[in-house]
Each structure stands twice: as structure tokens, then as C-alpha cells.
């Protein structure tokens, strides 16, 4: 069973926003952590960081299967769920993946 298309699209939108604002977020975070910068400047950086969209944080991205959109049991290396991995592996669609036997 596939996830709703809106849920998959929402996650893809979060990925694109995160990629777009990653450098800005990292710079602000570095300013906040730097003790040599004045407290006022660090506070302003904290305010700017909090005004960035919530979805620009990588924490909000869910690791989903590319084929079914399944949120759990998803292998990062192949970007598919365990169920799809087994199906594709059994018909030889994933290079280098062989059925184990001993």
C-alpha cells in the first residue's frame, strides 16, 4: 500500500527547502556557537535562525521509500523499503544484491 501522494510531496518539498537554505542555516548556527562574537550579535543570529522556515531543518525530513513512499523499514543505501528491496532483489533488479545461501 502506498502512502498518500500529498505526504510524499510534502517530504520532497522539505528536502528542496532544506537543500536551498542549508548554507544559511549553518552560518547562523556557527555564529550562535562562536563565543568570541558579542552576545548581541549571537542573539540576532538566533532570531534570524528562528525566522527561517521550519521545513528548512533536516530533522523534519523523513526517510521514505522512493517507490511506495513507505516511511518505515527503509534502507538508506537503496532508498527503498524492505518489502520493495526483497521484490526487486528476487527478480535481479538491484545490481550486486544476491540471495544469501550457506
Swiss-Prot record:
The protein's GO terms of the molecular function aspect are: rRNA binding; structural constituent of ribosome
Q: Cite a single GO BP annotation.
A: translation
Top-rank taxon: Bacteria
Does the entry feature the keyword rRNA-binding, yes or no?
yes
GO cellular component term of the entry, any: cytoplasm
The UniProt entry, under PROSITE patterns, shows: RIBOSOMAL_S14 (PS00527)
Keywords on this record? Ribonucleoprotein, Ribosomal protein, RNA-binding, rRNA-binding
Q: How does it assemble?
A: Part of the 30S ribosomal subunit. Contacts proteins S3 and S10.
Tell me its family.
Belongs to the universal ribosomal protein uS14 family.
- Function field: Binds 16S rRNA, required for the assembly of 30S particles and may also be responsible for determining the conformation of the 16S rRNA at the A site.
Output this protein's name. Answer: Small ribosomal subunit protein uS14
Q: Which organism is it from?
A: Ehrlichia ruminantium (strain Gardel)
Q: Which gene encodes it?
A: rpsN
Amino acid at each position: 500500500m502506498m502512502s498518500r501522494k500529498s505526504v510524499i510531496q510534502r517530504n520532497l518539498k522539505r528536502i528542496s527547502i532544506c537543500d536551498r537554505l542549508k548554507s544559511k542555516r549553518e552560518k547562523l548556527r556557527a555564529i550562535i556557537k562562536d563565543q568570541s562574537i558579542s552576545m548581541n550579535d549571537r542573539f540576532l543570529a538566533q532570531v534570524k535562525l528562528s525566522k527561517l522556515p521550519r521545513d528548512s531543518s533536516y530533522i523534519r525530513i523523513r526517510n521514505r521509500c522512493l517507490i511506495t513512499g513507505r516511511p518505515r523499514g527503509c534502507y538508506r543505501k537503496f532508498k527503498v523499503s524492505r518489502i520493495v528491496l526483497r521484490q526487486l532483489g528476487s527478480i535481479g533488479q538491484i545490481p550486486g544484491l544476491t540471495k544469501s545461501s550457506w
